[in-house]
């Protein structure tokens, strides 16, 4: 088919489509060419036109595009939450106030709270929207669980209402996409028995491929809650909670948490502390899953397990994780 039937210009054999559209500054001849070589095109990089890009510049451009996409996804998740008035609506806060009473209605303080729930919810909602809310002092007691003594700090039931709204409407939707599937603590639809079944599936997967070869590495983070650095929590709030009012509220919960060491530690028994600490090691979890490529791996609060067919490689991986 000739150039006349396609209504092409008379010099179509000596011009490429890029030069035809004016993308390259000079025509490139393709006549009698067995292989068309790739020629540099114009790129817009940091507000300047480039004909040639080095390898470092291409890597940087790809990184900036990936970074922009990640930031856009974070912004979309924050926009999906809505404004403060929607997140802490009267209907939602009243619903979470009712949930705070489940199982503890025999307490006098809970009965007083539920009896004044209509007016109390409106009062606390106004304080949250005006950024005047401050949590009350927690009740401290010790609990012996399977032979281990744990210090518990129970918040007042009026604060629990706000904690539940903050966790379910803000922290869980924003922290969830950053966590791996095999992180099963304090999440809806998961839990201890779910993790038992997940571990059983992973053991079956390993045995079908490697038999009895390999080993299991168990890790325990000592002083997980008492040693939680507040700086990392504030940094994660800055990265994921893009609404300044919501970020200030989440920072207030951390700042007023009872901890013996300034700038370090979160209390057991406070629901936002559970959500913060469940998502805190997400960077390590994603590194083990994605970078190290460990399929049989799980994380339940401060307990880790890794199943690997090569014992020596598993030891080396354990040192890298630590």
Which residues make up each language-model segment?
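Reverse-transcriptase-like RNA-dependent polymerase core
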Residues: 124-148, 245-258
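Active-site-proximal segment of RNA-dependent polymerases
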Residues: 24, 32, 80-84, 167-219, ...
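Glycine-/proline-rich flexible loop or hinge segments
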Residues: 99-111, 143-153, 180-182
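Short coil/turn segments at secondary-structure boundaries
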Residues: 109-113, 136-142, 177-183, 211-218, ...
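Conserved polymerase palm-domain catalytic core
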Residues: 202-301, 305-321
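Right-hand nucleic-acid polymerase module
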Residues: 36, 41-63, 67, 155, ...
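Conserved pre-motif C helix in the palm subdomain of viral-like polymerases
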Residues: 149-180, 262-290
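Non-catalytic, polymerase-adjacent accessory regions of viral genome-replication enzymes
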Residues: 2-122
